[in-house]
UniProtKB/Swiss-Prot annotation:
Transmembrane segments: none annotated. SUPFAM superfamilies: Nucleic acid-binding proteins (SSF50249). The gene is rpsL. Part of the 30S ribosomal subunit. Contacts proteins S8 and S17. May interact with IF1 in the 30S initiation complex. Belongs to the universal ribosomal protein uS12 family. GO terms for molecular function: rRNA binding; structural constituent of ribosome; tRNA binding. Keywords: Methylation, Ribonucleoprotein, Ribosomal protein, RNA-binding, rRNA-binding, tRNA-binding. The modification 3-methylthioaspartic acid is found at residue 89. This is Small ribosomal subunit protein uS12.
Length: 124
């Protein structure tokens, strides 16, 4: 335990929280334009072709965002909405594209977890 004198000379340092999504600048989502849509491979031990998009945000940041769900309609110059949330097996991918917002279509024939993929409720 530090003495009062020690604390007067050198106070305790406050821990600073690390921001995992700096490009959002404290906003819940940001709009952006796709500059490149491509696939990439995950880290070991996983194997797949993950769909990602390099996106230029309205605040001039350029980030890589993951396109979740099966199939997508994105191409260069598509308007997208970006939210936070990293992809654990893709280094450098710290953002997700919101499905069903702006130019991004929802996932077709999605029955469960529809709200996460912008899918409408199927007709009875």
């Amino acid at each position: 335990m530090a003495t009062i004198n020690q604390l007067v000379r050198k106070p305790r340092v406050k821990l600073v929280d690390k921001n995992n999504v700096p490009a959002l600048q404290e906003c819940p989502q940001k709009r952006g334009v796709c500059t490149r849509v491509y696939t990439t491979t995950p880290k070991k031990p996983n194997s797949a072709m993950r769909k990602v998009a390099r996106t230029r945000l309205t605040n001039k940041y350029e980030v890589t965002a993951y396109i979740g769900g099966e199939g997508h309609n994105l191409q260069e110059h598509s308007l997208v909405l970006i939210r936070g949330g990293r992809v654990k097996d893709l280094p450098g991918v710290r953002y997700h594209i919101v499905r069903g917002a702006l130019d991004t279509a929802g996932v077709k024939d999605r029955k469960k977890g529809r709200s996460k993929y912008g899918a409408k409720r199927p007709k009875a």
